[in-house]
Regions:
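A substrate-engagement module of RecA-like helicase motors
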Residues: 116-132, 137, 185-187, 191-314, ...
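Walker A/P-loop
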Residues: 155-176, 188
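Signature of the SF2 helicase/ATPase Hel1-core->accessory helical subdomain module
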Residues: 173, 179, 199, 204-207, ...
Length: 640
């Protein structure tokens, strides 16, 4: 096949120039195809030597083409070429080898050509929707929205679309995106902001689509890891941990439930479980031992994860989507270590919340309560019984039974200093939080207090000087504590114990959490970055203060980690535009105004607000907090 049947003339010329610039050495190109699969644009990703080049496939989007040259002119793939092409080819991409003159080509993996869809048969008086749902109301706005999304997915584009209330957005975006995913064997993600919309999709809209499309597909709702029971944690609980008989009964009921549950999902429970108990038995990412766990084969979370990996359509909330995205940012967009399986098409419903969700996700947070709770998980000096005294006490008890007396002496010699240093570290940390809290003691009442921390205003105040002095002491205590912990862990690791129940594992993970907490503490208290706004809140009627560092702008993060990785994305909501323009949304999200693969649509509501709606504001209503408010309001509405 002629190279010009696969690569446009301008792209051929660009590659010739780049290979010449690289002195004829290997160059790794990102090939960007048009709708018909012709490479119309190339971008240099890496330059190498005569025989090799870095293959940075994580910098490419799905459905593109790896192109690299062989300076020798011998266009036979190496073992590395085949391996890398195989990995990228799994995502629908292609891989070509060219010579330095760019007039010859070898196809390792052909570019997968996508099947285009046509949704016309589903809408209209004789459409499939109407045939399945007799009372279906045909709305021009819904068809207009659905056709716009059809064009976007067919053309490998992003689309921003505001559709007013009453459009029927979920059906409008589900039909084209789901149909496209099914026809091309792709995975679709629907990300929402609210539980209500997730339940609507799961229990109403998607089952309805199954009837309309008459096509087989699997779908699932992804829940956070903390919703699942962890068998290892559950059966490591000692009933003597709990003084209250009612608490012991709850633990017993959890164990009975484990015997019959298929999912281990907390929502199955008919009994409300206090969080203080649930968190001792739920699944947590950093406390998971994975395949090493004795319960791995029957793990609820990994069973759910397998179900997710086999699904064609996945429903998530925005927070989980960005939690997954942060992992992809660390290890590469197409990775097996992510929370979600790899995906190809994304719909963000309630997209006006994305910026806030992303900003919240990238926010650092510390609190007095959180600090005390974390240290208590390691060592709780107020409790002497084994289970609730913290993971350190459990580790010491375990080591005392596993090691002979001479080996345990080394541990025992560090025990006192480790506990004393933990206590001192805790006391100084609480002292700092209390110093921050003290100026607002008189204001604490029924409402939350929120203030921005302006370093220039407070740095010369006596209160800030006290905090700075205490923080210097706190840092010194942390350094000494870290040294002692390292000595303690080195002794343990030298013995290579089995740790079947994960007692040492849990202790190490809580220490890791403490290290991360201290890093966040330093970042917030130092207040040095101009890219963040620093602020705090004081909880009403409680001696708890929370401190935050929130990024001013997340657009670059979103541009680099999301928008540059995928094209087929739908951003929709009833409120995205300001005065009929998407400028603010685009700027806050990191969109390029000149992006040729972006379309924008503004669809009005089918409701005639001017003639069908009135706004009434009662001037004599009672306090909304009154128990009589609803009854009084009913009377008011009846009068209307």
């Amino acid at each position: 096949m002629s190279i010009r049947n696969l690569i446009a003339e301008n792209a051929i010329d660009d590659m010739k120039k780049e290979i010449k610039k690289a002195s004829g050495n290997e160059v790794f190109f990102r090939g960007i195809p048009s709708d018909d699969g012709i490479i119309v644009e190339v971008e240099v990703i890496a330059r190498g030597n005569e025989t090799s080049v870095a293959a940075l496939i994580n910098r490419m989007k799905k459905g593109e083409v790896i192109i690299h040259n062989h300076p020798s002119g011998f266009l036979v793939p190496s073992q590395n070429d085949i391996q890398i092409s195989g990995v990228y080819g799994e995502s629908g991409g292609g891989s070509y080898i060219i010579n330095n003159d760019v007039d010859d080509l070898y196809i390792i993996v052909p570019l997968k050509k996508m099947n285009k869809i046509d949704i016309n048969e589903y809408f209209g008086e004789k459409g499939l929707i109407k045939s399945k749902i007799e009372k279906f109301e045909i709305r021009d706005e819904q068809l207009k929205m659905s056709k716009a999304i059809e064009m976007a997915v067919n053309n490998n584009e992003k689309i921003i679309i505001e559709a007013g209330t009453g459009t029927g957005k979920t059906i409008a975006y589900l039909i084209p995106t789901l149909l496209y995913a099914i026809e091309n064997n792709l995975r679709l993600i629907i990300s929402t902001n609210t539980i209500n919309l997730q339940e609507q999709l799961l229990n109403k809209d998607i089952p309805l689509l199954k009837r309309i499309l008459n096509k087989e597909f699997r779908y699932t709702l992804v829940k956070g890891r903390g919703n699942y029971l962890c068998k290892r944690k559950l059966y490591n609980i000692d009933f003597e941990e709990f003084k209250e008989e009612s608490d012991k009964k709850i633990i017993g009921n959890l164990q009975k439930w484990d015997d019959i549950s298929e999912t281990g999902d907390r929502s199955e429970l008919k009994q409300e479980i206090p969080y203080r108990i649930w968190e001792q038995a739920n699944c947590e990412s950093d406390l998971c031992t994975g395949p090493k766990c004795n319960y791995y084969g029957s793990c609820y979370f990994f069973k759910a994860r397998k179900n997710i990996s086999e699904s064609d359509l996945i429903i998530v909330n925005h927070h989980m989507f960005f939690a997954d995205l942060s992992i992809r940012n660390e290890v590469g967009f197409n990775t097996e270590y992510s929370i979600l399986p790899n995906y190809d098409v994304v719909v963000f419903d309630e997209a006006h919340n994305i910026e806030d969700t992303a900003r919240n996700y990238f926010t650092y947070e510390i609190s007095r309560f959180g600090f005390g709770k974390l240290v208590g998980f390691i060592h709780n000096r107020r409790i002497t019984n084994l289970a609730n005294a913290g993971t350190l006490t459990k580790v010491l008890h375990y080591l005392n039974t596993e090691l002979d007396s001479s080996d345990y002496e080394k541990i025992d010699s560090l025990k006192t200093s480790l506990i004393e240093e933990l206590n001192s570290f805790y006391e100084k940390g609480i002292e700092i939080f209390d110093k921050m809290l003290y100026p607002f003691a008189q204001e604490i009442g029924n409402s939350e207090i929120k203030r921005r921390i302006d370093k220039d205003q407070i740095k010369n105040s006596s209160a800030w000087k006290d905090i700075t002095k205490a923080n210097t002491e706190f840092k010194h205590l942390y350094v000494e504590l870290a040294k002692t912990i390292n000595k303690f862990m080195n002794i343990i690791e030298n013995h290579e114990l089995e740790d079947e129940d994960g007692i040492i594992f849990d202790f190490k993970k809580y220490i890791d959490r403490l290290k991360e907490y201290y890093k966040n503490f330093e970042f917030i208290v130092n207040n040095d970055s101009e890219d963040y706004v620093y602020w705090f809140s004081v909880t009403p009627n409680k001696n708890n203060i929370k401190l935050f560092a929130t990024p001013f702008d997340v657009s670059e993060d979103l541009k680099e980690n999301l928008l540059s990785k995928l094209n087929r994305m739908v951003f929709t909501s009833a409120t995205l535009a300001v005065e009929g323009k998407f400028d603010y949304f685009m700027k806050s999200m990191g969109f390029d105004k000149n992006d040729k693969q972006l379309s924008k649509h503004l669809i009005s509501s089918p409701f005639d607000y001017m003639n069908q709606m009135r706004v009434f504001i009662p001037s004599d209503t009672i306090d909304p907090n009154s128990i009589d408010f609803i009854a009084e309001t009913e009377v008011f509405i009846d009068k209307l």
